[in-house]
Amino acid sequence: MNTVLMTHILAEGSMGMADIANEALLLFVGTGVGVVLNLYIPGSGTAIRSAQREIEEMFISLLSRMASELGTPGENGEQPDGRGFQALEQALGQAVEQGERRAYEGMENSLLADTRYYLAYMGLRKNQFAILCRMRDCFSRMESTPDQALVVADLLQSVSGSFHERNNALGLLDELEHVKLQMKAQPLPVRRQEFESRALLYLGLLELEQFLVLKKEFALGLSRDEIRRFWGRG
């Protein structure tokens, strides 16, 4: 656009008020057409929503797998080696990174697309993925499986079963608080190995709490318009 205007000015040799007004009008029309065309460029919303579904399905699988491993220890009480889990974990990490890139691309390619929500969503899942890895690390380091592991496994299944974009996690946080109170009320183990394993289990539970708190904060940070548009709630 600037090149066109400069060409006109050089061709004219001199510029009167009428010429300046004409060039200003040309600039206005050209810019306006560009903006309108940009507004109607198909956004990447469909691709991002597809990425969201893929990411959520992977989270559900990982949480369910973690619950199963925690609730069904090996013959000597040790946790499984988790090789299958690691493959799922790697796939989820890649999906989250790809989803975040798509959200940024949507922001760059369209003026009207409300990518603030998508960027916040992908940021949420990225942080939750990091927590999930730390949680898994806590459980895998347990040399024996405490009795309380079954309760935590049930909670993980609850999280997996209700894992969804529109879940604000408030009910799950209440359930988690109940599990924490149960664990605190039980006597401490005598043997060192049992003590360390229960401590790791509790650390994993605290990571799960942070996992849910992030979702609660994400939900509370949404505007009414975002809830209506992206969650379908008025």
Model-flagged regions — what are they?
Residues 1-35:
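Pore- and pathway-forming membrane helices of multi-pass small-molecule/ion transporters and channels
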